[in-house]
Curated annotation (Swiss-Prot):
Pfam families the record matches: Ubie_methyltran
Positions of S-adenosyl-L-methionine binding: 62, 80, 100-101, 117
The protein's enzyme class: transferase
An example Gene Ontology biological process: menaquinone biosynthetic process
Record key words, sorted: Menaquinone biosynthesis, Methyltransferase, S-adenosyl-L-methionine, Transferase
UniProt name for this protein: Demethylmenaquinone methyltransferase
Record pathway: Quinol/quinone metabolism; menaquinone biosynthesis; menaquinol from 1,4-dihydroxy-2-naphthoate: step 2/2
Function comment: Methyltransferase required for the conversion of demethylmenaquinol (DMKH2) to menaquinol (MKH2).
Recorded family membership: Belongs to the class I-like SAM-binding methyltransferase superfamily. MenG/UbiE family.
Reactions catalysed, as given in the entry: a 2-demethylmenaquinol + S-adenosyl-L-methionine = a menaquinol + S-adenosyl-L-homocysteine + H(+)
Listed SUPFAM superfamilies: S-adenosyl-L-methionine-dependent methyltransferases (SSF53335)
Gene this protein is translated from: menG
Length: 230
């Protein structure tokens, strides 16, 4: 995959993630300077999960995010379209399901909450993915999307772009089994909607009352919304 865009081939993306599963968690921690752990905790806190609730963790990868969500006492299932990623996390004691974000293998109104972290960019048609997530969520259920976004401080934003396009690929070549995956990451982040535009897309595709919270100066934005209904 020579150049990333928001028009991506699902097979290419799945194959790319299959190749990075073994070192994925370590690579993310190194490249984010440890912030990935903070972002996972903040996602759990934002969802305000209750014991016994059913939660879908979509694009869960190795399920490290699912384990964090399960600390709430909720029943959480990890779903990802990369079998290699799920296999790399098979030692984690959480339910796992292989599934495509555009055709989820779950019945209507199955979950109290759905979350997707750093995976919405990778769904072939992310708008259809948002609608599919709404389909499997109960009326009144919650959505949280954690995604790389647009830094809110201009000077910091300039430094961040330099890091994405210059330093990140170099570090990835040292710590990742497939550095091309992180070149894709950098390019797809640059093509992604900013916070306001993504909130508009979420509200237009099955959800309502979308707002967001910036993390680490807007490197990550956490969008939250509700499925309309009782």
């Amino acid at each position: 995959m020579a150049k990333a865009s928001l028009d991506k081939d699902p097979f290419d993306v799945a194959s790319m993630f299959d190749d990075v599963g073994d070192k994925y968690d370590l690579t993310n921690t190194v490249l984010s300077f440890g912030q990935d752990r903070v972002w996972r905790r903040r996602t759990r806190e934002r969802l305000d999960l209750k014991p016994g609730e059913k939660v879908l963790d979509l694009a869960a990868g190795t399920a490290v995010s699912t384990v964090e969500l399960a600390k709430s006492g909720a029943w959480c299932v990890a779903c990802d379209f990369s079998q290699g990623m799920l296999a790399a996390g098979k030692h984690r004691n959480v339910p796992m399901v292989v599934g495509d974000g555009m055709t989820l293998p779950f019945a209507d109104n199955s979950f109290d909450a759905v979350t997707i972290s750093y995976g919405l960019r990778n769904i072939h048609d992310f708008r259809a993915g948002l609608r599919e997530m709404a389909r499997v969520t109960k009326p009144g259920g919650r959505l949280t999307v954690a995604e790389f976004s647009t830094p809110v401080i201009p000077v910091f934003g300039t430094l961040y772009k330099e890091y994405l396009m210059r330093l990140l690929p170099k570090v990835a070549r040292v710590v990742s089994s497939n550095p091309e995956a992180y070149i894709y990451l950098a390019e797809s982040i640059r093509a992604w909607p900013d916070q306001e535009d993504l909130a508009r897309e979420i509200n237009a595709n099955g959800w309502s009352d979308c707002g967001w919270q910036n993390l680490t100066f807007g490197i990550v934005a956490m969008h939250s919304a509700i499925k309309p209904g009782n």
